[in-house]
């Protein structure tokens, strides 16, 4: 029978419940258990795909095409388990399903209420992902005390009652703030948070204390006493420089030991040598590479979470340190990139910042600075090449302008922006890509066909492929039917490669995405080359 672990948060949001859940998944998998992670999000949006990146961060795409919370990216990167759409559940999707069933008459005229109908649907979604795994870790988003998460907490409480104490446990992540003027660490917020959680009928089995420093035994003893949790089940999780150090820190604090004991998992010690060996590569890195992300969603760094993590993975693999810089495409200046070792132009939507990206890509192309384009980055590269190499001065995308006849980037044939469900109408999920032989891309992937995740509705217009190819642009990756351009590249350049897909979603710390890996190799080897001076 599957064992269930619910992870809740208290005091403030953004404490790292996702990293805690991912780290626990890592440790349990290292104990030879089969695991799966899940995120319950309390917002009313059915999916996060149309949410503002400044508010929500990036949208993570799963293999089966679900647009999900960015925490699923953490889960996959820490555990290596590819998740499905049922790994992310929102309040909006729950209510929509219940209302649909009510309209069909499935409730036989009953008065539809939060309890039992909403909570029953939540429980169905929680249980529906497990299949035959040993342990399921379900993170409940939000903060205890928020009105939005009450149905999720009630559903979790009912599950412990229905499945038994031995099969369901709760981990509560809280904050122990340091008060500067009095130089004290305060446990009162944690005590109040646990008290509130108990008011909902849930007593945490383990409390994870987030802090900006290591906590002494007195603090842990105090929390143990006032929150009625055994001392060994009070886990200190101080801030660390690298999130990939968290699993080892959690292990040293005894998190997986406490879970193993509480759920009677009867497992051996975790095998963590591979993870330790991966982290040891950081100590062998002596050279810095200056890489910039040229984008437009900089109000929240999480907007490009998977891109940043993929760069870290590649740097780790190549024994170099990442010196990451951020360049706003709205305020781009050539001086910003003239001394860089490489630039990534990631995905995005809308016309804002586009001309800055196109101008920057021209500079990168002409000055032989390594360039990696992703999704929108590929589209901007094609527009730049069409304008400045092919002589199509009005080249543009139909997404950005309707005042031109030269749409080198246009809607996919099956796309319809007038559809009611705009977000779900994109080309989403894993699709095959046929690699062109004797290209840089073929060296990167070493496979004739690869499978990568997509999230787009615009593509290279096939009407312009011939003129682009005649002028030197290489289509190094195509859909199996040759109708969609998946990758482009240039010869006689250290690295000028772009993809319509999102390689960052499949990158792992121990196995970097091949495109990012080659990009960092090129950036490191092309340092100190002569470049055009900026006036």
At which residue positions do the language-model features occur?
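Cysteine-nucleophile active-site neighborhood
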Residues: 18, 22-26, 30, 342-432, ...
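Flexible phosphate-sensing "switch/lid" loops adjacent to ATP/NTP-binding sites
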Residues: 1-320, 330-342, 349-350, 357-363, ...
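Conserved small/polar residues in nucleotide/adenosyl-binding loops
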Residues: 532-535
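Catalytic beta-strand/loop cores that center a nucleophilic Ser/Cys/Thr
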Residues: 437-492
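Short, hydrophobic alpha-helical segments
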Residues: 227, 259-269, 389-393, 519-527
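Beta-strand->loop->alpha-helix junctions that form or flank phosphate-binding loops
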Residues: 232-239, 325, 478-481
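A glycine-centered loop/beta-turn motif at secondary-structure junctions
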Residues: 487-518
């Amino acid at each position: 029978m599957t064992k269930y672990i619910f992870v809740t948060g208290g005091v403030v949001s953004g404490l790292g419940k996702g990293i805690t859940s991912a780290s626990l998944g890592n440790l349990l998998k290292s104990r030879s258990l089969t695991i799966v992670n899940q995120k319950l999000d309390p917002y009313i949006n059915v999916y996060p795909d149309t949410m503002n990146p400044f508010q929500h961060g990036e949208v993570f795409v799963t293999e089966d095409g679900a647009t999900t919370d960015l925490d699923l990216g953490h889960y996959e990167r820490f555990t290596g388990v590819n998740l499905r759409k049922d790994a992310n559940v929102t309040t909006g999707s729950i209510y929509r399903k219940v209302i649909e069933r009510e309209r069909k008459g499935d409730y036989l005229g009953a008065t539809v209420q939060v309890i039992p109908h909403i909570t029953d649907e939540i429980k169905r979604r929680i249980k529906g992902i497990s299949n035959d795994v040993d342990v399921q870790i379900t993170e409940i988003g939000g903060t205890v005390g928020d009105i939005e998460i009450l149905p999720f907490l009630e559903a979790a409480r009912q599950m412990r009652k229905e499945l038994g104490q031995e099969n369901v446990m709760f981990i509560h992540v809280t904050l122990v703030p340091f008060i500067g003027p009095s130089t004290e660490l305060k446990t009162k917020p944690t005590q109040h948070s646990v008290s509130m959680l108990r008011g909902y009928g849930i007593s945490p089995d383990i409390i994870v204390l987030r802090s900006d420093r290591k906590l002494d035994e007195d603090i842990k003893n105090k929390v143990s006493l006032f929150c009625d949790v055994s001392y060994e089940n009070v886990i200190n999780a101080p801030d660390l420089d690298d999130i990939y150090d968290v699993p080892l820190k959690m292990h040293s604090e005894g998190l997986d030991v406490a879970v193993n004991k509480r759920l009677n998992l009867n497992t051996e010690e975790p095998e963590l040598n591979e993870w330790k060996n991966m982290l040891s590569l950081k100590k062998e890195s002596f050279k810095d590479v200056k890489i910039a992300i040229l984008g437009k969603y900089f109000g929240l760094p999480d907007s490009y979470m998977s891109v940043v993590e993929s760069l870290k993975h590649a740097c780790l693999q190549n024994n170099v340190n990442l010196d990451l810089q951020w360049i706003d495409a709205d305020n781009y200046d050539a001086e910003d990139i003239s001394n860089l070792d490489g630039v990534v132009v990631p995905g995005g939507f809308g016309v804002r910042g586009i001309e800055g990206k196109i101008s920057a890509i021209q500079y990168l192309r002409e000055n032989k600075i390594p360039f990696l384009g992703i999704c929108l980055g590929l589209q901007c590269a094609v527009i730049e090449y069409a304008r400045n190499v092919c002589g199509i001065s009005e080249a543009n995308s139909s997404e950005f302008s309707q005042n031109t006849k030269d749409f080198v980037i246009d809607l996919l044939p099956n796309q319809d922006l007038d559809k009611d469900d705009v977000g779900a109408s994109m080309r989403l999920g894993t699709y095959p890509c046929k690699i062109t032989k004797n290209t840089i891309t073929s060296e990167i992937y070493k496979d004739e066909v690869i499978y990568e995740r997509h999230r787009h509705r615009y593509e290279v217009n096939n009407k312009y492929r011939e003129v682009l190819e005649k002028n030197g642009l290489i289509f190094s990756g195509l859909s199996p039917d040759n109708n969609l351009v998946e990758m482009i590249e240039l010869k006689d350049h250290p690295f000028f490669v772009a993809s319509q897909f999102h390689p960052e979603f499949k990158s792992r710390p121990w196995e970097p995405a091949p495109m990012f890996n080659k990009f960092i190799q090129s950036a490191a080897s092309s340092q100190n080359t002569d470049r055009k001076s900026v006036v």
